[in-house]
Amino acid sequence: MALLTKATRKKWFKYLGLGEYNKTNILKMQRMYFKNPKDQDGVYGKDTDRLLRHLHHTKAYTTSFAPFEFACPCGKCTGYPTWMRAKELKHIQKIRNHYGVPMKITSALRCPSYNARVGGVDDSAHLSGYAVDFYMKGVTDTLEERKSAINYIRKLANHDFSYCNGYNSYGRKVSAPRMGNAVHTQTK
């Protein structure tokens, strides 16, 4: 994947309120989002490019979420091993709007190491920014509520697959106890 053009970077820095596109503001952005000091060097490379794409997409395609809510929680990677894709962000925003209650993201972006640690499949959509696991109070508390939510979600444009502990979007029983009361949804 090629880095964003310098013209696009300048435009997106302005759109995101990050100031002029320069080394000082690149470093400021890195310090805001990258947890490890080793990733905070003021250099615009692949990691920073993925972060900028993620920041842009989160602002452009959602109104209810902050960029950090999607970060990989492993503490070893930058937190942004890829970026959330526009289709998935639009998808979860529609779900959030439909139910009208806050959505807690329980898992979104994952680096390969964290994905393996939590038992994710090798080709998990979390690795490419096309999946989110979430919990919504009063919407996903019981199996019946989660089934109802999945049946709504599967009718949305670009839906690929959803599941929870006890059910999936094909109407089959699923054993996924690690999911708790969360629902997984992914787009294609």
Identify the residue ranges that each predicted region occupies:
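Short acidic, glycine/serine/threonine-rich helix-capping segments at coil-helix boundaries
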Residues: 2-53
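Active-site acidic/histidine clusters and adjacent loop/turn architecture
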Residues: 51-100
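Surface-exposed patches in mature extracellular/periplasmic domains of secreted proteins
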Residues: 39-41, 101-109, 161-170
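Second-shell loop/turn segments in exported
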Residues: 12-18, 37-40, 74-85, 136-140, ...
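Catalytic cores and adjacent binding grooves of peptidoglycan-active enzymes
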Residues: 121-188
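A mature extracytoplasmic/lumenal domain signature
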Residues: 44, 107-109, 136-138
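Extended, low-complexity, intrinsically disordered C-terminal regulatory tails
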Residues: 90-119
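Structured segments of extracytoplasmic/periplasmic soluble domains
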Residues: 15, 28-36, 54-58, 94-98, ...
